[in-house]
């Protein structure tokens, strides 16, 4: 079964797409968030590429978890607390078994840290994951 981009997003990436300060999240051209006036916004971006940052055949759950973890650890190193994140996912094909386990790993950490996914992009190509938090 081949999923369209919007079917893929709806099925695997909208379960945890709202949070405090999120006016508009997953599914539109961009996200709208409210930052309290007494805070600063720290932003980081990391990309995970198959056969560079993880081996082909690595458990997709672990790939999802690690992809968010590397960003949140960068924020922690600066004394910042994660607020939300975006996900850009490049896939050779929309394999539902991979997407199911990947999204479970990703959202296990997102729920633990109470940070919503607020947007991103999906496209076809060599497997890579880019997250900004």
Predicted regions and their residues:
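Gly/Ser/Thr-rich beta-alpha loop segments that engage phosphate groups in nucleotides
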Residues: 27-29, 66, 81, 121-122
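A generic alpha-helix structural signal
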Residues: 10-13, 72, 103
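Long, contiguous hydrophobic alpha-helical segments, chiefly transmembrane helices and signal peptides
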Residues: 42-48, 52, 68, 72, ...
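Glycine-rich anion-binding loops of enzyme active sites
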Residues: 48, 82-133
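Glycine-rich anion/phosphate-binding loops
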Residues: 22-24, 55-70, 94-104
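Ubiquitous "structural anchor" signal
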Residues: 33-35, 72, 127-128
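A short, N-terminal amphipathic alpha-helix
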Residues: 67-78, 107
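Extreme N-terminal cap/leader segments of soluble proteins
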Residues: 1-59, 78, 87, 109, ...
């Amino acid at each position: 079964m081949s999923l369209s981009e919007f079917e893929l997003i709806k099925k695997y990436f909208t379960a945890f797409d709202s949070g405090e300060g999120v006016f508009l999240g997953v599914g539109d051209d961009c996200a709208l968030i409210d930052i309290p006036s007494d805070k600063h916004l720290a932003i980081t971006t990391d990309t995970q590429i198959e056969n560079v940052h993880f081996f082909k055949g690595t458990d997709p759950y672990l790939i999802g978890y690690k992809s968010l973890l590397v960003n949140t650890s960068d924020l922690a190193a600066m004394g910042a607390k994660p607020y939300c994140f975006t996900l850009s996912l490049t896939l050779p094909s929309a394999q539902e078994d991979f997407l199911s386990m990947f999204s479970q790993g990703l959202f296990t950490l997102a729920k633990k840290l109470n940070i919503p996914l607020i947007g991103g992009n999906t496209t076809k190509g060599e497997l890579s994951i880019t997250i900004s938090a």
